[in-house]
Amino acid sequence: MQRVLGTAIVTVWMVVLAGTGWADMGKTAPALKAAPGSKAEAHLKEGIEHYNQGHFDVALKHFMAGAKEDPQSAEAHYNVALALDKTGDHKAATEHFKTAYDLGKNNPDIQNSGILKAHLKMK
């Protein structure tokens, strides 16, 4: 009886945690490569390497350089937003997610991004 009750309690907690997003804590949304022909390509490539290693502050510098080089790059703004989120600047991250969303209408990775939708309070 105690074993069944214990299993039931664990199962309920797993469902609760999954529903609140806590089950995904610690996961990092992937940074995006530049669109073909983008002037930001070299900066984003370097930034992605640092981002994947958890060097979010260094990645941010590269992503910002990419966004400056190609202000119309949705991927650059998206990556800036990811790095800003990781470094704790959520207000600025939200601004860059909005820009990425507006510029990236044809990019399903951006349009369907969970973290972007959370920042923009979308469903």
Where are these regions (language model features)?
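Register position in tetratricopeptide repeats
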Residues: 52-53, 86-87, 119-123
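Canonical tetratricopeptide repeat
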Residues: 45, 79, 113-114
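Conserved structural position within tetratricopeptide repeats
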Residues: 64-68, 102
